[in-house]
Amino acid sequence: MPATTLPVSPISTLSTVELTLDRALLLQKFFNENPAYFLATSGEPAGPNEGAEEITSELPSGWSFTKKWVVGYANTDGSLAAMANVITDLMALSVFHIGTFIVATERHGGGDAQVLYQGLERWAASNGAAWMRLGVVQGNTRAERFWASQGYVAVRQRSGIQMGTRSVTVQNMVKPLMGGAIAGYFTLVPRDQPESESAP
């Protein structure tokens, strides 16, 4: 069944909002105040239109999916404490892809990222996800360690990807939510097999 409602925040002081284009400035402010993700991936702070682009950017032509969710985790004053971009049923039913997951720098080190991600994962599983998928820029050590600690395994790499001022290598990672073997995932998403040279 396609996801029709936002995930619920597992942190009681935060509430979730869908970040549509009318909230682009709110997302842009969050990006500007929390540049660490962008510095680690593209080598430069978020661009002036990054918030709107995060919300409106489209997938490559021909890629199947059900919905792109851009979710904000809002403080009581309305400002954002975290955000996640999740694409449901990407390239195959039951594959949910995390495009972006950022937690405010001031919340690092206290377990909030783990709690928020686990809530997102529960939401995905309750809406039919059997596999979670994402890409990590090699050298972004904090992200690499975080996703490995959440049970993700590396499946393939893509090199020569331009992100801002940098040419980077992206490591695709996958996590089974229902105990499936990785061979079953490759049947659903053959482009993620290690020898595949296709775009992600």
Q: Where do the language-model regions lie?
A:
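Conserved acetyl-CoA-binding loop of GNAT-fold acetyltransferases
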Residues: 148-158
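Acetyl-CoA-dependent GNAT
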Residues: 2-108, 117-119, 123, 160, ...
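Short hydrophobic/aromatic beta-strand or adjacent loop that forms the aromatic wall/cage
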Residues: 68, 168-172
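Conserved beta-strand-loop-alpha-helix junction that forms the acyl-donor binding cleft
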Residues: 134-144, 161-166
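Conserved GNAT acetyl-CoA-binding A-motif
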Residues: 124-135
